């Protein structure tokens, strides 16, 4: 077996890993966007050229030189004899799936149905982007007419509204049956790999996260993706049970089931994430802490509350919905977020809101002219359901509402009265800024809060620096203590740390069992 | 274990920064709302800061009993003890 860490080895994100057996059959583990590398060359208004996107990314060494790309984007061939059986997508975060659009549509995408739902919701509520394209039309070569119009012949162009354009039909595969509502083709997971293969969900900050295990030659190989552990105390488990219910408690227990399934798999090579092993943290927040701190803030104000968290972080949605219910407030989602919720409910009935929960959900009617695909569907559905809320209704009763609104949504608050915004509360309940751009965004965001005298929680400015406090966020990644316990109990034969800045942490504990090379041959 | 003076010193610094008052105003006898001008949200924010700084959990029921800076110092001292 050969393990090639193509990206995401000594950095956080951008995972691209290939596993190849002795017969040159192989598979890929994630195909994410490496934000730090991307930021070295590109920013919001400086991007690779869509008409030569793979040429550009290959030249900048942002994607590996493998025969895995869509033929409408790239017609080159590399000296690489590997047959790619599938690409496993561990979870729908861009640093793991953000370049999946480039992949040859004939290579099946293996993931949970929830991950597919979140990816679809993300793609179909945003402007089209080749990097994340899941379906639609393939690009085409330039025509004579294009040449006449001065377009260079080595570029590819958008097919526009052409009815003759070739469809981009993805092959997708799931560990359990999923009802599709797009034109992807489903491939039986059992047919993907010549040996044993299983995908088991893990608990992470996005619904649908999963790990994979496959038999490769005479070894078992397992890949965790990103994960955190579930409730570690009886008190925390009680919180889940009381707040979210028995069925949803299962969400938090997914990680332990994944590792339980690996116990009898020997010899075992474990590719494992180590995001937090560098961080010095004296506080280990849980979802229960987030709930309790949010309750304090909600009880402390009669003003409008704005909460910032990604809706695909489903237990956070449940947490704030519950807090709203306890405080007789309606949770107001943007149409785009409502689209996410509908997609997730469609794929996994377990996540469906109860009638009581649903009665506390509203959808904001933003001052937008253009709605994209699923976002438009969600808006129209909210109108049909009678839960579409105008800014005026929030102005009338700010004490009855909590808006889910982040940085990109803030222009929409300009429709609210200044009196309502003055003294309103903003709760930052998501991760901190990691990149320089995000820090600039955060600084800009503080201007909004200051201008309207909105009281921030979870984020503050100290001597001109933005500080993210942790009261409203529980990390989606396993703690160093949790990881050490898991690895000691599992006792894998080989450990391959990825998604970490501190591989030495693993070497200190498991020494010669830790494999650090970019290419590992076993 | 931190002494009462050490706890008071940290509490004073947090209150001063959070409420924008001079440290000399933050005496053990000073009332958070009446003397230092804290509102209900300031209290929530302060409590979370104390929890983070001292690694203690402030029970919501106990919060109602806290009126002065000295009450906070005593509460933290007891929790740490």
Curated annotation (Swiss-Prot), chain B:
Keyword terms, alphabetized: Cytoplasm, Fatty acid biosynthesis, Fatty acid metabolism, Lipid biosynthesis, Lipid metabolism, Phosphopantetheine, Phosphoprotein
Free-text description of this protein's post-translational modifications in UniProt: 4'-phosphopantetheine is transferred from CoA to a specific serine of apo-ACP by AcpS. This modification is essential for activity because fatty acids are bound in thioester linkage to the sulfhydryl of the prosthetic group.
Localization, UniProt: Cytoplasm
Main location class: cytoplasm
GO annotation, cellular component aspect: cytosol; membrane
The keyword Lipid biosynthesis is annotated on this UniProt entry: yes
Pathway note: Lipid metabolism; fatty acid biosynthesis
Residue span, Carrier domain: 5-80
Organism domain of life: Bacteria
InterPro entries linked: ACP, ACP-like_sf, PP-bd_ACP, Ppantetheine_attach_site
MF GO annotations: acyl binding; acyl carrier activity
Purpose: Carrier of the growing fatty acid chain in fatty acid biosynthesis.
NCBIfam families per UniProt: acyl_carrier, PRK00982.1-2, PRK00982.1-4, PRK00982.1-5
HAMAP family in alphabetical order: Acyl_carrier (MF_01217)
Family that this chain belongs to: Belongs to the acyl carrier protein (ACP) family.
Protein known as: Acyl carrier protein
């Amino acid at each position: 077996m050969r393990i090639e860490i193509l990206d995401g080895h000594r950095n956080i994100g951008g995972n691209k890993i290939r596993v190849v057996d002795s017969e040159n059959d192989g598979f890929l583990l994630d195909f994410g966007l490496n934000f730090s590398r991307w930021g070295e060359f590109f920013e919001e208004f400086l991007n690779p050229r869509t008409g030569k996107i793979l040429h550009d990314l290959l030249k900048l060494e942002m994607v590996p030189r493998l025969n895995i790309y869509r033929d409408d984007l790239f017609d080159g061939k590399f000296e690489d004899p590997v047959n790619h059986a599938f690409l496993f997508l561990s979870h729908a975060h861009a640093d793991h799936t953000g370049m999946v659009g480039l992949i040859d549509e004939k290579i099946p995408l293996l993931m949970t149905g929830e991950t597919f739902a979140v990816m679809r919701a993300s793609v179909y509520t945003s402007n089209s982007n080749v990097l994340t394209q899941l379906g639609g039309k393939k690009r085409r070569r330039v025509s004579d007419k294009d040449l006449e119009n001065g377009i260079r012949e080595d570029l590819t162009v958008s097919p526009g509204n052409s009815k003759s354009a070739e469809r981009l039909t993805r092959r997708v595969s799931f560990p359990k049956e999923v009802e599709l509502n797009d034109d992807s083709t489903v491939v039986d997971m059992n047919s993907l790999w010549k040996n044993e293969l299983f995908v088991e969900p893990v608990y992470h900050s996005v619904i649908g996260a999963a790990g994979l295990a496959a038999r490769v030659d005479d070894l078992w190989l397992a890949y965790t993706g990103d994960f955190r552990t579930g409730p570690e105390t009886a008190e925390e488990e009680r919180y889940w049970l009381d707040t979210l219910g028995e069925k949803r408690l299962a969400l938090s227990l997914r990680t332990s089931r994944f590792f339980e399934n690996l116990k009898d798999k020997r010899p075992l090579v474990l590719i494992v994430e180590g995001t937090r092993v560098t961080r010095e943290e004296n506080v280990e927040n849980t979802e229960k802490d987030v709930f309790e701190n949010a309750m304090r803030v909600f009880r402390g104000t009669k003003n409008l509350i704005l909460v910032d968290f990604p809706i695909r972080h489903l237990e956070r949605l449940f947490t704030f919905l519950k807090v709203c219910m306890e405080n007789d407030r309606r949770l107001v989602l943007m149409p785009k977020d409502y689209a996410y919720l509908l997609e997730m409910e469609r794929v996994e009935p377990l996540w469906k809101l109860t009638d009581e929960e649903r009665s506390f959900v509203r959808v904001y009617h933003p001052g937008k002219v253009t709605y994209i695909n699923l976002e438009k569907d969600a808006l129209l559905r909210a109108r049909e359901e009678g839960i579409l809320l105008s800014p005026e209704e929030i102005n009338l009763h700010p004490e009855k509402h909590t808006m889910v609104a982040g940085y990109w949504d803030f222009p929409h608050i300009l429709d609210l009265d200044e009196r309502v915004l003055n003294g309103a509360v903003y709760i930052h309940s998501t991760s901190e800024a990691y990149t320089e751009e995000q820090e600039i965004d955060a600084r800009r965001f503080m201007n909004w809060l200051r201008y309207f005298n909105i009281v921030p929680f979870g984020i503050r400015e100290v001597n001109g620096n933005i500080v993210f406090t942790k009261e409203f966020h529980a990390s989606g990644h396993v703690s160093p203590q949790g990881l050490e316990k898991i690895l000691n109990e599992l006792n894998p034969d080989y450990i391959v740390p990825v998604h970490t800045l501190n591989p030495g942490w693993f070497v200190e504990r498991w020494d010669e069992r830790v494999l650090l090379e970019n290419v590992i041959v076993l | 274990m931190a002494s009462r003076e050490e706890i008071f010193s940290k509490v004073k610094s947090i209150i001063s920064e959070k409420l924008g008052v001079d440290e000399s105003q933050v005496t053990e006898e000073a009332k958070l709302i009446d003397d230092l001008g804290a509102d209900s949200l300031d209290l929530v924010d302060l409590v979370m800061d104390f929890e983070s700084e001292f690694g203690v959990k402030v029970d919501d029921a106990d919060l109602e009993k806290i009126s002065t800076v000295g009450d906070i110092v005593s509460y933290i001292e007891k929790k740490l003890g």
